[in-house]
C-alpha cells in the first residue's frame, strides 16, 4: 500500500486520470473517492503532493516530486506524514513515454 503520493500535475485532469489508472479507484467511483479530506496532509488516507506540487515548487518536470517522495521516507519533509514506508511518484498520463517510481524504506523491503 502507498503511504503518500506525489503526482505530476501540469493539468488537474491528469492527476485524476493517473490515480484511476493506477488502481486507487475505479472510474465509476471517482465522485466518492476524490474528496479533499482523502488527499490532505497529514491526516488523509492518501496524502497527495505534500510539497505543494507544481503550484508551490516542482514544475521542473517532476524532479521535485521525487525529492519529496524520498524526504517523506527519511522523515525530512516540511509537511511530514507519519510512518511513511512506501512513497509513490506518478509522472503521467497524457504524454508518452512516462515513468513512475515507488520508493521504499528498508522496513518495506
Language model segments and positions:
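Claisen-condensing/thiolase-fold acyl-transfer catalytic domains that form or cleave C-C bonds
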Residues: 1-109
Amino acid at each position: 500500500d502507498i503511504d503518500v503520493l506525489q503526482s505530476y500535475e501540469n493539468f488537474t485532469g491528469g492527476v485524476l486520470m493517473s490515480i484511476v489508472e493506477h488502481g486507487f479507484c475505479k472510474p465509476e467511483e471517482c465522485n466518492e473517492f476524490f474528496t479533499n479530506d482523502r488527499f490532505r496532509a497529514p491526516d488523509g488516507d492518501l496524502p497527495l503532493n505534500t510539497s505543494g506540487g507544481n503550484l508551490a515548487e516542482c514544475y521542473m518536470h517532476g524532479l521535485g516530486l521525487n525529492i519529496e517522495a524520498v524526504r517523506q521516507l527519511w522523515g525530512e519533509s516540511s509537511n511530514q506524514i507519519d510512518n511513511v514506508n512506501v512513497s509513490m511518484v506518478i509522472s503521467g498520463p497524457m504524454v508518452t513515454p512516462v515513468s513512475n517510481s515507488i520508493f521504499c524504506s528498508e522496513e518495506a523491503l
